[in-house]
């Protein structure tokens, strides 16, 4: 009898497994490429993915972070900046058989040339040189800055061991993380111009090398005469090592929709070309319009503290947003919650967000995106406690923090008889993105 019951249970489990509704993948299933991720370039919302959190060797798409940090340091002031090539820039690459532009120790290279050499020629010696520029003068310092930026972005599946992407057991990223790294880099002055250049770039002679060097676009998907040409791709970085195989990250735009697409560990080069085309064709066919998500009227109270004392309460609400939803989905398929700290301390960037979550069903990846929430009453609270006129109205945390970060942390309540006498304005930190 027990045996019969066991057999019956087994049959029932099998029947349930066969006829239970299966979760259908929101995007194409790729067999020749291990992992991919497609996000909306504007909000960072994940649209489709396969193994997007798998930690893989990135190869030269590493240089997106290197170039982003160099652009951040330069703040658009490229002209007149000269970098001196060190012994380590050149000889740390000995025996790697990696891409380079034959920089020589002691050579002085304009920053602009180093940027385009690293971007277009995928020069590992150029990446080393740039890492010293935004680090503390050493490659190790540059790598530390890269990992600090990873932490700042809240990414969980990335660690860099070098600025160029030569395979190392401690050097890895994921498709999701790399998509968010590119999204961040695109906000840095000059990066998008660098990333999207198609024309040949001439590097003039230097104080050591008398001949010009020329850098060409290496991505066949951006060459009009190539059979692999994809007009929607605006900018890209390609990567390859024997261990990483083929990796790719691009910015693509069509009919006002901007996407970031990352593929990693494609078996052969033609697999990469074909799979990127498949992914972009899918995305642009299914995502054609942005949808306004109205404010839902969520309200919560948040304690504000300064000078070690509570100052009062402010009101936090969801602001509404605009999301790229798959055709067939509506604002009704999006839910929102508020994400607040225990208290907001003056002098810090307020980590106050509305989290919008898409129920993608079988049409879109179910994913979330964080948007700065709206804070009401902060200026009035400060006026009551400090006597400082900051204006009135409702501000998002990004704008409010820009007014407040410079306020002295020695601010106390009126009962203490102390008022703030110094106020400076500076920009708030960018919010972290997570899926």
Specify the residue positions occupied by each region the protein language model found.
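Hydrophobic, aromatic-rich alpha-helical transmembrane segments
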Residues: 1-4, 114, 397, 401
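Residues in and immediately flanking transmembrane alpha helices
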Residues: 15-16, 76, 206
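Domain-terminus/edge residues, biased toward the C-terminal soluble/receptor-binding domains
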Residues: 155-156, 169-172, 176-408, 420, ...
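Sec-dependent N-terminal signal peptides of Gram-positive bacterial secreted proteins and lipoproteins
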Residues: 3-24, 404-423
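Active-site-adjacent loops and short helices of periplasmic peptidoglycan-processing enzymes
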Residues: 23-176, 180-189
């Amino acid at each position: 009898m027990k045996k019969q019951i066991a057999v019956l249970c087994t049959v029932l489990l099998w029947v349930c497994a066969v006829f239970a509704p299966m979760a259908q993948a929101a995007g194409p299933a790729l067999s020749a490429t291990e992992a991919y991720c497609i996000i909306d370039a504007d909000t960072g919302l994940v649209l489709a993915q396969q193994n997007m959190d798998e930690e893989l060797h990135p190869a030269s798409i590493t240089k997106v972070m290197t170039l982003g940090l160099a652009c951040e340091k330069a703040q658009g002031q490229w002209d007149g900046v000269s970098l001196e090539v060190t012994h380590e820039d050149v000889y740390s690459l000995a025996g790697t058989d990696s891409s380079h532009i034959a920089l020589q120790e002691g050579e002085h290279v304009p920053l602009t040339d180093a940027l385009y050499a690293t971007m277009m020629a995928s020069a590992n010696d150029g990446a080393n040189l740039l890492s010293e520029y935004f680090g503390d003068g050493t490659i190790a310092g540059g790598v530390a800055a890269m990992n600090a930026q990873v932490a700042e972005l809240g990414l969980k599946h990335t660690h860099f061991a070098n600025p160029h992407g030569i395979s190392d057991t401690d050097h890895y990223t994921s498709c999701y993380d790399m998509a968010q790294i590119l999204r961040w880099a695109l906000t840095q002055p000059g990066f998008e111009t660098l990333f999207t250049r198609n024309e040949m770039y001439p590097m003039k002679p230097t104080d050591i090398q008398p001949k010009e060097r020329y850098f060409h676009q290496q991505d066949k998907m951006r060459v009009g005469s190539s059979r692999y040409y994809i007009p929607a791709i605006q900018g890209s970085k390609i990567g390859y090592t024997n261990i990483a195989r083929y990796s790719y990250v691009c910015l693509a735009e069509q009919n006002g929709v901007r996407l970031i697409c990352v593929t990693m560990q494609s078996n052969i080069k033609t697999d990469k070309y074909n799979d990127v085309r498949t992914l972009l064709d899918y995305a642009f066919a299914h995502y054609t319009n942005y949808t306004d998500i109205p404010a839902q009227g969520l309200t919560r109270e948040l304690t504000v503290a300064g000078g070690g004392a509570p100052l009062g309460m402010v009101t936090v609400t969801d602001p509404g947003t605009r999301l790229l939803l798959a055709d067939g989905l509506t604002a009704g398929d999006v839910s929102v919650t508020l994400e607040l700290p225990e208290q907001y301390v003056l002098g810090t960037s307020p980590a106050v967000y509305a989290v919008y979550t898409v129920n993608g069903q079988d049409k879109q990846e179910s994913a979330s995106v964080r948007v700065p929430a709206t804070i009401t009453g902060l200026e009035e609270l400060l006026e009551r406690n400090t006597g400082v006129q900051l204006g009135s109205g409702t501000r998002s945390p990004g704008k409010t923090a820009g007014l407040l970060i410079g306020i002295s942390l020695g601010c106390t309540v009126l009962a203490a008889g102390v008022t703030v006498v110094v106020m400076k304005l500076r920009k708030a930190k960018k919010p972290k993105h997570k899926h």
